[in-house]
Amino acid sequence: MQIYKLNKEDIPGVWLTIRPFLDSALNKYEVSKKFPLECVLRDLVSGASQGWVIVNDSGVVVSAIVTEIEHYPLGDTVIIFLMGGESMGDWGDLLHNAIVKYAEEMGAKWIETGSRRGIGKLFYDRLGYKRRYESYSYEVKCE
């Protein structure tokens, strides 16, 4: 397995490959209701977000990831905004190591991500991530 950080100029050429992974991640957690796929593409192409792919030993993309850098008064955070793919157990550590290296290069103090509890227990807890809060969402019905 290999992980690659994509240059913003690479995005149009790989979009058809990474789109299904990102679309699935957006829809799984209903994020697409407030952040449509077209906006993900816009942010990747503009450089506001960073795109990553994980490629298996056969050269097949098995995951697509989107990160963002959030600037806070006391330090920057690399946020894993979207992650879609299969068999995270095969590449999760690879992703973690790459994001840690990227955070160090960017001078970020933290890495944050959201996750289902099951993935958190199996993956993030083991790597030393701390659960800081749980996120809840309520959809207001405008009539």
Residue ranges, per PLM feature:
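Acyl-donor binding region in acyl/amide transferases
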Residues: 73-126
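Short glycine-aromatic motifs
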Residues: 48-49, 124-131
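Active-site rim helix/loop that mediates acceptor-substrate recognition in acyltransferases
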Residues: 30-49
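Conserved catalytic-core motifs of GNAT/GCN5-like acyltransferases
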Residues: 114, 130-142
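Residue-level detector of flexible, active-site-proximal loop/helix-junction positions
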Residues: 10, 87, 142
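Short amphipathic alpha-helix that is part of the acyltransferase structural core
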Residues: 1-35
